[in-house]
């Protein structure tokens, strides 16, 4: 058992426009060099663009749907047993699911070739809400890896 102190979880304030904790976390992950206002403007304009293209009522509904389609259920972790390393499938906790989904959406948006970051993020969110796009492919890839290593599930700790 570790002797270190248990760190206190920092409270992230909800974002000013939609009062959403998830969106606030998304803004923090997108942010570069502490420029939060830039990250906020990128996300808000991307959500407005997505709402124009979509048949949904609110952009938060679409954002939630995009996150749901990207959230992983299982992932693999390396476990060393008797000189060989196994990829052991483990279930992902809710907080990590959200974080991974957000990270993958932002990562996929940055790799796109659209003109501005707003446009790239809008396209990635729209694709993710429809169950396609690179972020959804990443999730399916992780699930496939966990499925193929199911035989090592008994090494879970």
From Swiss-Prot:
Q: Name one GO biological process term.
A: translation
- Record key words, sorted: Ribonucleoprotein, Ribosomal protein, RNA-binding, rRNA-binding, tRNA-binding
RNA-binding as UniProt keyword: yes
One example of the protein's molecular function in GO is: tRNA binding
Q: Which Pfam families match?
A: Ribosomal_S7 (PF00177)
UniProt cross-references to Gene3D superfamilies, sorted A to Z: Ribosomal protein S7 domain
Cellular component per GO? Answer: small ribosomal subunit
InterPro entries in alphabetical order: Ribosomal_uS7 (IPR000235), Ribosomal_uS7_bac/org-type (IPR005717), Ribosomal_uS7_CS (IPR020606), Ribosomal_uS7_dom (IPR023798), Ribosomal_uS7_dom_sf (IPR036823)
Q: How does it assemble?
A: Part of the 30S ribosomal subunit. Contacts proteins S9 and S11.
As for what it does, the entry says: One of the primary rRNA binding proteins, it binds directly to 16S rRNA where it nucleates assembly of the head domain of the 30S subunit. Is located at the subunit interface close to the decoding center, probably blocks exit of the E-site tRNA.
NCBIfam families registered for this protein in UniProt: rpsG_bact (TIGR01029)
Family designation: Belongs to the universal ribosomal protein uS7 family.
Tell me what this protein is called.
Small ribosomal subunit protein uS7
């Amino acid at each position: 058992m570790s002797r270190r102190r248990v760190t206190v979880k920092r409270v992230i304030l909800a974002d000013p426009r939609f009062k959403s904790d998830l969106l606030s976390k998304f803004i923090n992950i997108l942010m570069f060099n502490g420029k939060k206002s830039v990250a906020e403007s990128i996300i808000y304009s991307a959500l407005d663009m997505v709402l124009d293209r979509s048949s949904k009522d609110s952009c938060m509904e679409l954002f939630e749907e995009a996150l749901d389609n990207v959230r992983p259920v299982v992932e693999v972790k390396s476990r060393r047993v008797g000189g060989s390393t196994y990829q052991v499938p483990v279930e992902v906790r809710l907080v990590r699911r959200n974080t991974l989904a957000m990270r993958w959406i932002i990562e996929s948006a940055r790799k796109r070739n659209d003109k501005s970051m707003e446009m790239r993020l809008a396209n990635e969110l729209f694709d993710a809400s429809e169950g396609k796009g690179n972020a959804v492919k990443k999730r399916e890839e992780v699930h496939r890896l966990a499925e193929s290593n199911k035989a090592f599930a008994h090494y879970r700790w």
